[in-house]
């Protein structure tokens, strides 16, 4: 008997031999075959296109069909203007029919780059015989394209590839039949539809959608159709659609409950450079320290979300064996053990000496309300020197703390006087909370090696508790604003560069030079970034605005959820302050990933007329997608709108009554757009049948065509696995 517990070994990924099959052009001695050999020190060992006019391409033919998993590009030993800044890769079993496998770009350096190619459809691997590389843009504007070396890797074991090839052929045939079925049904060719389905036994869609089509398109039973849609929503079938919709931000200012008459002493005052953490289990926000414009603070507060109330835990933590007054420090919370850690601070050059420059490290126990000094000087214990504007993350599972970056404070001269001494930045450290020991994981490095990381200040660092990676991006190093983005796997000690910041994705990623506050949602695999005001006076513009960005970790893509309408000064009657927080820096943002709410407090609004001004406003931010209830109401509206239009043709009086009652209740009358659309519907009562535009289906009656159009709209809310194919048969006809 075979070993029951044995796991099948993963198929081996190996280099795939190929030959040059076709090319668009080449110039002089820069032949396509040159990409078969890797000679980084030979400037002539490359393919170069004759021009940069599209389409330029190379088609590679594999020795035999294979699952092509990766493509590697070799380069010249120096940067080169002809390197590919943007390119696409396509693949397929024949050169006439290819699928896009990759859209990316190369860095303009000498390092080889490997990219993963799309090689699965619905989790099933598919084979390719041909690979087409299409250059789109070179690093030097208007230069010809050059490719120095190409390597393909994947699986070409016939025992694995052949079943994939069989599946792929069957899949293509099945999709072709489904396109025919869709076409026949749209045109009401009932006999042809039924005959093809009976013969092939291939389903066009999930039975539930067939049921909806039957009730809606064939029978016009709108009530039954609504019931089926309601069942679909309640069964969670619209969840996938909801997860793909863009967020809309909803800010609301929090006005905490006041217990005393004066109302001043029972909430934190104005400040910037403070720190906040949140206990998501108890829904409590903890706030400590900061700078009020004239002095550092040592007060410690807790805000209960449930009670909507601030409680002052301590007016001065130093008096309770805790940290002294400070700002630009960092805090992190261990929710499992209910403990808060704080490290670092900013010290003015006038008060710096060998004693004050020691980096103390404290832990606060929430349940016993006590502070404990873990270290008088972390540098003496193998940890970081005294730093400010660093970042700190907690790994509760392994009981570890990670701290990275920050400016090291020194005795000599002012921090701003770069001539007195080159600024020093702190590396990446790990603190084992159990053993109370520090370990240096990465020193600050300016080298561009694959495992090197560059220290910085004012950056973002987040810990993903599920994939166990730190994510680091942005920040500043001396006068340079950084926009690279990398992850660090804490278990394998490996750095992965997500973006080196050289690609000009202007407008597609958060801008550098602005204060960024970031949070992470490990469950949704999302990083959230609030971009505010620049600390740099020269960079501060009058029309500065907040923007909120979301990075999708799985899709490796940024999206901007909103940029505020800088409306306060353009429209004095509308105060921006009432709707959302004004742009600022030195503020704090925390995220409750359990209840999906952000909390923001205080900061510096950067008013040159009042440089000491600090804020004490408190806000919550919810990122909202369409709810199930909204989608159900919207679907009912679409169905009833269509029903009304049908009635309007037959019985205008009955239609008017239907409009005023049944259709009216599916509209949100507080929404101006919905209200306007609803008001325009009445015009249907005065249209003749010929006024309606059909789908262009000359062979089906108007009602059938309109109902089919409504059905196609409703289908969009269902998961792709349930729906008919997205394309149309007629679209395959080329002129």
Swiss-Prot record:
Entry-linked Pfam families: Beta-prop_ATRN-LZTR1 (PF24981), Kelch_3 (PF13415), Muskelin_N (PF06588)
CTLH domain span: 206-258
Gene3D superfamilies for the chain: Galactose-binding domain-like, Kelch-type beta propeller
All residue ranges annotated as the LisH domain in the record: 172-204
GO biological process: actin cytoskeleton organization; cell-matrix adhesion; neurotransmitter receptor transport postsynaptic membrane to endosome; regulation of cell shape; regulation of receptor internalization; vesicle-mediated transport in synapse
Compartments reported by the entry: Cytoplasm; Cytoplasm, Cytosol; Nucleus, Nucleoplasm; Cell projection, Ruffle
Keyword Chaperone annotated: no
Example of a GO MF term: protein homodimerization activity
Key words of the record: Acetylation, Cell projection, Cytoplasm, Kelch repeat, Nucleus, Repeat, Synapse
Superkingdom of origin: Eukaryota
Keyword Lipoprotein on entry: no
Coiled coil: none
Main location, first listed in the record: cytoplasm
Gene Ontology cellular component list: cell cortex; cytosol; GABA-ergic synapse; nucleoplasm; postsynaptic endosome membrane; postsynaptic specialization membrane of symmetric synapse; ruffle; ubiquitin ligase complex
Database matches in InterPro entries: Beta-prop_ATRN-MKLN-like, CTLH_C, CTLH_complex_component, Gal_Oxase/kelch_b-propeller, Galactose-bd-like_sf, Kelch-typ_b-propeller, LisH, Muskelin_N
Residues modified as N-acetylalanine: 2
Domain notes: The LisH mediates head to tail dimerization.
Assembly description: Homodimer; may form higher oligomers. Identified in the CTLH complex that contains GID4, RANBP9 and/or RANBP10, MKLN1, MAEA, RMND5A (or alternatively its paralog RMND5B), GID8, ARMC8, WDR26 and YPEL5. Within this complex, MAEA, RMND5A (or alternatively its paralog RMND5B), GID8, WDR26, and RANBP9 and/or RANBP10 form the catalytic core, while GID4, MKLN1, ARMC8 and YPEL5 have ancillary roles. Interacts with RANBP9. Part of a complex consisting of RANBP9, MKLN1 and GID8. Interacts with GABRA1. Interacts with the C-terminal tail of PTGER3.
Cited function: Component of the CTLH E3 ubiquitin-protein ligase complex that selectively accepts ubiquitin from UBE2H and mediates ubiquitination and subsequent proteasomal degradation of the transcription factor HBP1. Required for internalization of the GABA receptor GABRA1 from the cell membrane via endosomes and subsequent GABRA1 degradation. Acts as a mediator of cell spreading and cytoskeletal responses to the extracellular matrix component THBS1.
Name of the protein: Muskelin
Organism: Pongo abelii (Sumatran orangutan)
Taxonomy of the source species: Eukaryota, Metazoa, Chordata, Craniata, Vertebrata
């Amino acid at each position: 008997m075979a070993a029951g517990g044995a796991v099948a070994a993963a198929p081996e990924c190996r280099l795939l031999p190929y030959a040059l099959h076709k090319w668009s052009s080449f110039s002089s001695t820069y032949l396509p075959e040159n990409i078969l050999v890797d000679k980084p020190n030979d400037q002539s060992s490359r393919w170069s296109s004759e021009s940069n006019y599209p389409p330029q391409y190379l088609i590679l033919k594999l020795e035999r069909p294979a699952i092509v998993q990766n493509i590697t590009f070799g380069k010249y030993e120096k940067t080169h203007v002809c390197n590919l800044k943007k390119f696409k890769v396509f693949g397929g079993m024949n050169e006439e029919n290819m699928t896009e496998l990759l859209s990316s770009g190369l860095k303009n350096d000498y390092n080889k780059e490997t990219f993963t190619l799309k090689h699965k459809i619905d989790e099933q691997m598919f084979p390719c015989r041909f690979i087409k590389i299409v250059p789109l843009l070179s690093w030097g504007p208007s230069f010809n394209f050059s490719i120095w070396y190409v390597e393909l890797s994947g699986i070409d074991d016939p025992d694995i590839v052949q079943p994939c090839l069989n599946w792929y052929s069957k899949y293509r045939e099945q999709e072709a039949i489904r396109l025919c079925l869709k076409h026949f049904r749209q045109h009401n060719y009932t006999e042809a539809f039924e005959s093809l389905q009976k013969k092939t036994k291939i389903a066009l869609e999930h039975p539930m959608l067939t049921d909806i089509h039957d009730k809606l398109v064939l029978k016009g039973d709108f009530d039954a159709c609504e019931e089926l849609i309601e069942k679909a929503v309640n069964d969670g079938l619209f969840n996938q659609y909801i997860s793909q919709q863009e967020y809309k931000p909803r800010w609301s200012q929090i006005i905490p409950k006041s217990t005393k008459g004066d109302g001043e002493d029972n909430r934190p005052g104005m400040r910037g450079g403070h720190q906040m953490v949140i206990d998501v289990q108890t829904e409590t926000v903890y706030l400590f320290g900061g700078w009020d414009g004239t002095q550092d603070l040592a007060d410690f507060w807790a805000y209960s979300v449930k009670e909507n109330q601030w409680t002052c835990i301590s007016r001065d933590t130093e008096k309770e064996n805790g940290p002294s007054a400070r700002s630009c420090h960092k805090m992190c919370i261990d929710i499992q053990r209910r403990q808060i850690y704080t490290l670092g601070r900013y010290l003015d050059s006038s008060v710096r000496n060998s004693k004050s420059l020691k980096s103390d490290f404290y832990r606060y126990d929430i349940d016993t309300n006590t502070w404990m000094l873990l270290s008088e000087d972390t540098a003496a214990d193998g940890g970081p020197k005294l730093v400010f504007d660093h970042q700190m993350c907690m790994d509760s599972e392994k009981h570890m703390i990670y701290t990275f970056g920050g400016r090291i404070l020194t005795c000599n001269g002012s921090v701003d006087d770069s001539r007195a001494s080159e600024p020093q930045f702190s590396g990446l450290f790990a603190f084992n909370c159990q053993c109370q020991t520090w370990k240096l994981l990465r020193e600050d490095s300016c080298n561009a090696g694959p495992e090197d990381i560059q220290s910085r200040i004012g950056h973002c660092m987040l810990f993903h508790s599920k994939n166990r990676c730190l994510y680091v991006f942005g920040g500043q190093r001396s006068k340079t604003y950084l926009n690279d983005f990398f992850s660090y796997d804490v278990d394998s000690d490996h750095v992965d560069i997500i973006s080196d910041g050289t690609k000009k994705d202007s407008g597609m990623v958060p801008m550098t030079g602005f204060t960024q506050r970031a949070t992470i949602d490990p469950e949704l695999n999302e990083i959230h970034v609030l971009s505010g005001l620049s600390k740099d006076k020269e960079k501060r513009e009058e029309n500065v605005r907040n923007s909120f960005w979301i990075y999708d970790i799985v899709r490796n893509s940024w999206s901007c959820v909103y940029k505020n309408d800088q409306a306060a000064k353009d429209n004095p009657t509308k105060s921006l302050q009432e709707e959302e927080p004004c742009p600022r820096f030195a503020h704090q943002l925390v995220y409750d990933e359990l209840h999906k709410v952000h909390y923001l407090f205080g900061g510096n609004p950067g008013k040159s007329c009042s440089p000491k001004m600090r804020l004490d406003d408190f806000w919550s931010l919810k990122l909202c997608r369409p709810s199930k209830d909204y989608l159900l109401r919207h679907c009912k509206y679409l169905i009833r709108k269509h029903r009304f239009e049908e009635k309007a043709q037959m019985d205008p009086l009955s239609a008017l009554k239907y409009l005023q009652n049944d259709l009216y209740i599916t509209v949100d009358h507080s929404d101006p757009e919905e209200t306007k659309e609803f008001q325009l519907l009445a015009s249907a009562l005065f249209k003749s049948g010929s006024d309606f535009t059909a789908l262009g289906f000359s062979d089906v009656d108007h009602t059938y065509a309109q109902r089919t159009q409504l059905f196609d709209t409703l289908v969009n809310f269902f998961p792709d696995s349930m729906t008919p194919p997205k394309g149309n048969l007629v679209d395959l006809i080329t002129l």
